[in-house]
């Protein structure tokens, strides 16, 4: 195992999978082409390429939460710079078995060294993926329960409810961030869905775990149907 770059750490290699920072445009293009949402998240600012045998086979993008100030309601004393969300992840099937959890683990080791101000990482498994977060379980994230969010489906794409409720005078709407303008201009055709999201947290600084305001819960089983849990 090795950390690349001196004095600035730029990646992490576990001997099988390597991650290193890549240009935002490169990462965004891969996500748009391959991620199930086909949409980027503009608040992502850590863009990591995933390499197997020297070949770029995937991307992980970390950044702010949709509500950056929400961290303190999850872990007491959290400032915006103290936590990240895994906003987007895509790996090619040729990356191999267990590549997702390995890539996440490598990315966490990298972030811990490169961004020491980050104390915890949060991610959500989306019910649309039908797996309830088994990748995060394999990467030793802890599970903190589920909640239901409203999504809107338009022409085969899903949009978070926040994009339906944004003011038409807001910058996000005018710039069509997250497809807000597209969604609202076509709201009569949009289909409403209520979908569960499963919250996972990884504490990079174990001392911060005691500050968590949520109760850790047993992992949901990925093979259970939605009505069973």
Question: Language-model segments: which ranges?
Answer:
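Hydrophobic helices that insert into or interface with lipid environments
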Residues: 171, 208-214
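An active-site-proximal beta-strand-loop segment
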Residues: 37-45, 53, 67-72
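Short, cationic low-complexity segments
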Residues: 213-229
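Acyl-donor binding region in acyl/amide transferases
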Residues: 21, 63-190
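Short hydrophobic/aromatic beta-strand or adjacent loop that forms the aromatic wall/cage
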Residues: 45, 195-200
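Glycine-rich phosphate/pyrophosphate-binding loop shared by adenosine-nucleotide-utilizing enzymes
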Residues: 15, 54-60, 81-84
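Short amphipathic alpha-helix that is part of the acyltransferase structural core
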Residues: 2-42
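Conserved beta-hairpin
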Residues: 31, 44-64
């Amino acid at each position: 195992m090795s950390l690349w770059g001196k004095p600035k750490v730029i990646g992490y290699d576990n001997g099988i999978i390597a991650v290193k920072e890549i240009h935002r445009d490169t990462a965004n293009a891969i996500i748009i082409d391959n991620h199930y949402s086909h949409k980027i998240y503009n608040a992502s600012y850590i863009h990591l390429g995933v390499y197997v045998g020297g070949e770029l086979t995937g991307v992980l993008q970390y950044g702010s939460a949709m509500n950056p100030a929400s961290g303190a309601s999850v872990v007491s004393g959290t400032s915006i710079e103290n936590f990240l969300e895994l906003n987007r992840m895509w790996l090619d099937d040729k990356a191999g078995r267990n590549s997702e959890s390995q890539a996440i683990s490598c990315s966490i080791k990298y972030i811990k060294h490169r961004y020491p101000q980050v104390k915890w990482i949060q991610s959500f498994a989306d019910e649309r993926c039908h797996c309830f977060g088994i990748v995060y379980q394999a990467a030793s994230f802890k599970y903190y329960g589920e909640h239901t969010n409203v999504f809107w489906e338009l022409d085969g794409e899903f949009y978070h409810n926040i994009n339906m409720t944004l003011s038409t005078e807001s910058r996000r709407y005018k710039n069509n961030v997250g497809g807000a303008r597209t969604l609202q201009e076509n709201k009569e055709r949009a289909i409403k869905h209520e979908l569960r999201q499963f919250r996972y947290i990884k504490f990079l600084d174990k001392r911060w775990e005691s500050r968590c305001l949520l109760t850790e819960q047993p992992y949901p089983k990925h093979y259970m149907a939605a009505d069973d849990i």
